Regions:
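A sequence-level/structural motif corresponding to short, flexible coil/turn segments enriched
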Residues: 20-445
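Bacterial Sec-dependent N-terminal signal peptides
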Residues: 1-32
Length: 445
């Protein structure tokens, strides 16, 4: 009879070493992600990049706001805040820049390239001079339609006596626009719906959706929320011509039926004409805020933001706040959720699909443990790539010893990545600071 003992022992040892716990499990095999350049643009005061898009000529454009009227700013008449739009070619050369606004506080939040190769911008304005022809009181939604060269074709203000802030714009299937942001319902005394809707009592800030024609004429408007603070940050049109709006809510009444505690991700689905079809709250007992939504490519949606919870819908939390990602069905059912971060404050601000079918997330991090292995000091810009199942493929922190944030990121045609935000650093990855805070542009590949 053959003695098989040595063979059996060898097989057992092979299995043991193959399953060694010294190998990291669940950590991404981080590839070398090279920083091609880091640029800061601005003047002696405060600048910030909020939104970036690919343009039809293979370049890109950035919208934010600027306070300075020196340094990199051109033809800006004073040091009030204005919308700041910058257009770059495919070789990263600045082709042109424009500021839009008046003599008060005007800040760009989001923009798109339109079907006619122009641009549509949204944010808020407190001005009633220069580029502004009206102000209804405090902050108004301010929408600007531009041609391909950045000239204003039309502009519209929407609001009442309170702080009404525009946060997102999309071009709709009928070639018009849907804009959303916060309506101060208390200050508007219940105004803001294009039709009377009964006796339900709203208060505080509500989601406000306004449908515009291609020429900027209001077709309808509707607000949604409760009696506390409800803030939308993003919107997407559905296949049936309705809309999904996402943001945060700490209300637990009127339109909100299932608040988990404090602020939740609050998602609403409205019809083509603004009728509320359903609403869902996702989160835990602490503060959870959704900031961006994208189509997952399989008929569902991915929503990113941050969470301070570790109960109810949030299965785990690494620390003070984690970047939180959920996958949701078209009916508003939670499919899965995933958190990323360390023991400090980590947040997600944008999500977009990449050419290889994965997803790019931008945000910020103060951690140097958990999913993070590096922190340059205070807040760093944080860039992550995940697969469709939410597995972290790689991530990169970029910053200096002061406060640096990423608010948006896109993949270019050559698969390089441009991330934008703001920076107060002048060391580490960021060599120059022009003023208090600068518009930050990072190219990685």
């Amino acid at each position: 009879m053959l003695n098989n003992t040595p063979l059996i022992l060898s097989f057992i040892l092979l299995i043991a070493f193959s399953c060694s716990k010294t190998e990291p499990i669940g950590k991404p095999n981080t590839p070398t992600l090279n920083i091609d350049f880091v640029k800061t643009l601005g003047g002696s005061l405060n600048e910030r990049g909020e939104s970036i898009i690919n343009t039809n000529d293979e370049g890109y454009a950035i919208l934010g706001y600027a306070q300075s009227n020196d340094g990199d700013l051109i033809n800006k008449p004073d040091n009030s805040f204005d919308y700041w739009l910058l257009k770059f070619d495919k070789n990263h050369n600045l082709e042109w820049q424009r500021t839009y606004g008046g003599s008060d506080d005007d800040r760009g939040a989001h923009f798109i390239q339109t079907n006619d190769n122009g641009y549509a911008l949204i944010g808020y304005s407190k001005s009633n001079d220069r580029d502004l022809t009206e102000n209804n009181g405090a902050n108004d939604f301010w929408v600007c339609k531009l041609n391909v060269s950045g000239d204003i074709l039309w502009k519209k203000s929407f609001g009442f006596l309170g702080a009404d802030n525009g946060n997102a714009i999309i071009q709709t299937q009928d070639n018009g626009f849907l804009i959303t942001g916060v309506l101060d319902v208390s200050a508007s005394n219940g105004q803001g719906n294009s039709k009377a809707t009964g006796t339900k009592r709203h208060a505080g800030g509500d989601y406000w959706a306004i449908k515009l024609s291609n020429s900027g004429e209001k077709q309808w408007s509707k607000f949604f929320g409760g009696t506390f603070t409800d803030t939308p940050f993003d919107v997407i049109q559905t296949k049936d011509k309705g809309y999904i709006l996402i943001g945060s809510s700490d209300s637990e009444d009127v339109d909100i039926q299932d608040n988990k505690g404090s602020y939740d991700f609050w998602v609403i689905n409205i019809s083509e004409t603004g009728m509320l079809l359903w609403e869902k709250s996702f989160g835990g007992s602490q503060i959870d805020e959704a900031h961006a939504i994208c189509d997952s490519g399989d008929g569902n949606y991915l929503i990113v933001g941050d969470t301070r919870s570790n109960d109810f819908d949030v299965s785990s939390n690494n620390g003070a706040a984690d970047l939180w990602l959920i996958k949701m069905s078209p009916e508003g059912d939670l499919i899965w959720e995933q958190n990323y971060g360390g023991v400090s404050f980590d947040a997600g601000r944008s999500i977009s699909k990449t050419q290889d079918g994965n997803f790019l997330i931008s945000g910020s991090s103060r951690s140097l443990d958990g999913d993070l292995s590096e922190n340059k000091g205070q807040n760093d810009a944080w860039l992550l790539k995940i697969n469709p199942e939410g597995t972290l493929l790689w991530h990169k922190t970029i910053g200096g010893s002061n406060i640096d944030f990423a608010y948006d990121a896109i993949e270019l045609n050559d698969k390089s990545i441009i991330t934008i935000g703001e920076s107060s650093s002048n060391d580490g990855d960021i060599s120059t600071n022009k003023g208090f805070s600068d518009l930050l542009i990072i190219k990685t590949k």
